[in-house]
Amino acid sequence: MAFIALGINHKTASVAVRERVAFTPEQMVEALQQLCRLTTSREAAILSTCNRSELYLEIDHPTADDVLAWLADYHRLTLDELRACAYVHQDEDAVRHMMRVASGLDSMVLGEPQILGQMKSAYAVAREAGTVGPLLGRLFQATFSTAKTVRTDTAIGENPVSVAFAAVSLAKQIFSDLHRSQALLIGAGETITLVARHLFEQGVKRIVVANRTLERASLLAEQFGAHAVLLSEIPEELANSDIVISSTASQLPILGKGAVERALKQRKHKPMFMVDIAVPRDIEPEVGELDDVYLYSVDDLHEVVAENLKSRQGAAQAAEELVGSGVTEFMQRLRELAAVDVLRAYRQQAERLRDDELGKAQRQLANGADPAEVLAQLARGLTNKLLHAPSVQMKKMSAEGRIDALALAQELFALDEGAPRH
């Protein structure tokens, strides 16, 4: 049995690679079931965000070569392409990695809170797919507990900083006064919700939310006094938009160079600020070639993010220590679990011996035997039967010269005297 955490993230792979290895929500259940069917993975969960795609596994051997091969094949990459940017963590390192990820310590934005919710969603989907069992389930629960402790006991989450916040901060650098700016937000998920909140708090003049379903767009728009439209209405909204921020789960670009070019002509080449947070990308990279367009991808936000992280660096060490404690506690409990089956079998054996002796004593009492003598025989019989198998095995080990095993038996039975002598 081994735990494995493997994948790619913003530190090891470009956005061009990450979008190729991303899983859509629609793919997730089928992918999980295929992963467990075609590899040695006994339990599995997949976390796929704009910054990382990771697989968390419980497998029956300590290598993940077949899983890497499956991941490359699933996303139509060569194995060499994937190996060039993939990482593999095993057992204690895998546990530590999961806890660091959930705590926001491995994020582009140190301490960002969204990743914990995303990991909880990954766990829920894996449960729906039937690919999470008792071991991986325990690891997820321990991970959530540690991440909660980090969040409540350190300042890692203070001074809100996220990719969404970084995008709005960058917009403020382009348009110093957002009160006169109009924003078009594409998508209606968690990241776009955060963007909308930050823009609303900055007093942006007008927000339009475009989404595949009008119902979802309207639910988000209502929170911030925004206007909701369908994706098909984006071309009409572009000309009025100073700020365009997109984050959907679409597998194909939503905005192309031609549509933006036409909008710029209507705007008389007034600057347009665009941030594509999606992986795969929502906005064709060629849009960035247009004059008067400031197009940023999620990778371009690194510099803005770094500037906003200084206040959280001091809390990072305390958070790492809490993660270390969480890892130690989980690994100890995991080792204790290894004894559960043995203890259960030992107890069942002892209970069978007890029942045999108790039945014999009850029959003797029913036949009129002296109760005191029956009790004495019960005690002697139970003692002899409980000691018989261990006694036979210890004599055998002694005859074989296995002094270390005898010393272990003394520790196991908490004996104070009679230690074997070398």
Swiss-Prot record:
Keyword Membrane on entry: no
Site (Important for activity): H97
Catalytic site positions: C50 (nucleophile)
CDD domains: NAD_bind_Glutamyl_tRNA_reduct
Keywords: NADP, Oxidoreductase, Porphyrin biosynthesis
Protein's pathway: Porphyrin-containing compound metabolism; protoporphyrin-IX biosynthesis; 5-aminolevulinate from L-glutamyl-tRNA(Glu): step 1/2
Binding site for substrate: T49, C50, N51, R52, S107, E112, P113, Q114, Q118
Annotated catalysed reactions: (S)-4-amino-5-oxopentanoate + tRNA(Glu) + NADP(+) = L-glutamyl-tRNA(Glu) + NADPH + H(+)
Enzyme Commission number(s): 1.2.1.70
Domain of life: Bacteria
Enzyme class: oxidoreductase
GO biological process: protoporphyrinogen IX biosynthetic process from glutamate
Molecular function GO labels: glutamyl-tRNA reductase activity; NADP binding
Signal peptide: none
Family: Belongs to the glutamyl-tRNA reductase family.
Miscellaneous: During catalysis, the active site Cys acts as a nucleophile attacking the alpha-carbonyl group of tRNA-bound glutamate with the formation of a thioester intermediate between enzyme and glutamate, and the concomitant release of tRNA(Glu). The thioester intermediate is finally reduced by direct hydride transfer from NADPH, to form the product GSA.
Function: Catalyzes the NADPH-dependent reduction of glutamyl-tRNA(Glu) to glutamate 1-semialdehyde (GSA).
Self-association state and partner proteins as the record states: Homodimer.
Domain notes: Possesses an unusual extended V-shaped dimeric structure with each monomer consisting of three distinct domains arranged along a curved 'spinal' alpha-helix. The N-terminal catalytic domain specifically recognizes the glutamate moiety of the substrate. The second domain is the NADPH-binding domain, and the third C-terminal domain is responsible for dimerization.
Name of the featured protein: Glutamyl-tRNA reductase
Organism of origin: Pseudomonas paraeruginosa (strain DSM 24068 / PA7) (Pseudomonas aeruginosa (strain PA7))
Gene name for this UniProt entry: hemA
